[in-house]
Amino acid sequence: MGILFSHCSGGREKEDKISKTDRAVLNLKIQRDKLKNYQTQVLEIAIAKECSKAGKKNQALLALKKKKYQEKMLDESFANLQNIEELIANVEQAEIQVRIFESLKQGNESLKEIQKEMSLEDVENLMEETAEAIQYQNDISEALSGKFSKEEEDDLLNELDEMEKQLNAQQYPKVPETQLPKIELPIEDAIEEGKQRKSTTNGLNHILIIACIINHIF
């Protein structure tokens, strides 16, 4: 009993899954198969009657009339069969088109949901912020790499010339008018003293130049 009930319930579930379109197509195919079987039976009956009653004129004439009538019915059945075949094809094609439409509809709804999360204004703002960040990074790279325009380089060179002039003026003061007493030193000591003075002066010059350039940059 339980097995029977399970079979019945399973059959109902399968029926629920069958759509109206499926039932219509199934009925059309059943009618098509019946027409095909009828065509075969009519041909067999017509031939049998014609052969069995050919010896009698009246019966042969009646058989021919029946055969003619059956041929007309066959022609009509062929036409109906063709119409049924076309109708089945149209129904199946319409069902495919409905499925395609539903798929397109679902895809369109999904696309709209995605577009709600990513508006055009948000994309434009993101692109603008990205461009600004890239430009800022390029400016930092140029500053760190020491690239200057021609005008800036000319200004730096002029500033360097002015500093050198000031340093030279400070390095070489005016010669006093009074004559200083001569101090004789050994030749080796005089040469060594001159080298030390020159080294000290050059070192100070370089330090001052570097300090001015750093001050100008920052």
From Swiss-Prot:
From the broadest rank down, the organism's phylogenetic lineage runs:
Eukaryota, Amoebozoa, Evosea, Eumycetozoa, Dictyostelia
Q: Report the main location listed first in the record.
A: membrane
According to the record's subunit comment, the protein's assembly and interactions are:
Probable core component of the endosomal sorting required for transport complex III (ESCRT-III).
Give the Pfam families listed for this entry.
Snf7
The record's subcellular location field reads:
Endosome membrane
Q: Which UniProt keywords apply?
A: Coiled coil, Endosome, Membrane, Protein transport, Transport
The protein, known as: Charged multivesicular body protein 6
Membership in a protein family:
Belongs to the SNF7 family.
Record's bilayer topology term: Peripheral membrane protein
Matching PANTHER family: CHARGED MULTIVESICULAR BODY PROTEIN (PTHR22761), CHARGED MULTIVESICULAR BODY PROTEIN 6 (PTHR22761:SF5)
Task of the protein:
Probable core component of the endosomal sorting required for transport complex III (ESCRT-III) which is involved in multivesicular bodies (MVBs) formation and sorting of endosomal cargo proteins into MVBs. MVBs contain intraluminal vesicles (ILVs) that are generated by invagination and scission from the limiting membrane of the endosome and are delivered to lysosomes enabling degradation of membrane proteins.
Would you name any one GO CC term? ESCRT III complex
